[in-house]
């Protein structure tokens, strides 16, 4: 890990998302999902979004974009662009960006970034969701679905659907 990431992780350690009751939400009970993705991963989320729409599950994508403003992606699904101006020097999002994302209630948050990408890690920590999912181990996440380095985001999202179908809830 770089010195910059170490400093960012230290700064992030003092921040918390608003409290939310943690819960493993099965696929059949999902209503709102947040995907944290980088602009080069947008084509990989389309199949997941289509699968969700068939089940009347709303999906919102937080797109981390570091490019030029005039080349900002305009995907055909519910999204929020987080550009360079919405992060500080260390990659931690500003209050406004987090407030915008926290204005919706999410059952599940899915981080498509990796352990070294502090921007997606910071958003994952600061946004409220009942269940947080990633493909790497971190205390922030409730479910970590291990995949190898060659697994692309589309395959990972297919695995997320499989795992969410496997969750069983007991009603008392």
Task: Label every model-predicted segment.
Residues 63-69, 134-140:
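Short, polar loop motifs at secondary-structure junctions
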Residues 139-172:
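Active-site-proximal region of nucleotide-activated glycan assembly enzymes
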Residues 34-57, 61:
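Histidine-anchored nucleotide/phosphate-binding helix
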Residues 14-18, 81-99:
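Glycine-rich, highly charged phosphate/nucleotide-binding loops
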Residues 36-40, 65, 112-114:
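Structural motif
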Residues 114-127:
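An aromatic- and histidine-rich active-site surface loop
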